[in-house]
């Protein structure tokens, strides 16, 4: 099972998201082809209601602790309640390019 599949499986089980997008962004960095080191996760879940943004991130870090310690170098998290997601027009945030790309 790929790292991306593991991330998706764990998040689905823990948060039952209304929307989930996991993007492998390793190709945007100095990573080898097929690498799974940099990910962007957009998670929309009612579980995030009444939880501060820092605490939301902490819950994801705790859930993916093993992967963060062994495989994942960078994890961009965009975490929303269904209401917050609707307020931002259900738009997936764009990622910035790695500062080292093209040097």
UniProtKB/Swiss-Prot annotation:
One of its GO terms (biological process) is DNA-templated transcription. Gene3D superfamilies: BolA-like (3.30.300.90). The keyword Iron does not apply. InterPro entries: BolA, BolA-like_sf, BolA/IbaG_stress_morph_reg. Keywords: DNA-binding, Stress response, Transcription, Transcription regulation. It comes from the Bacteria. SUPFAM superfamilies: BolA-like. The keyword Transcription applies. Pfam families: BolA (PF01722). GO terms for cellular component: cytosol. One of its GO terms (molecular function) is DNA binding. Belongs to the BolA/IbaG family. Transcriptional regulator that plays an important role in general stress response. This is DNA-binding transcriptional regulator BolA. The gene is bolA.
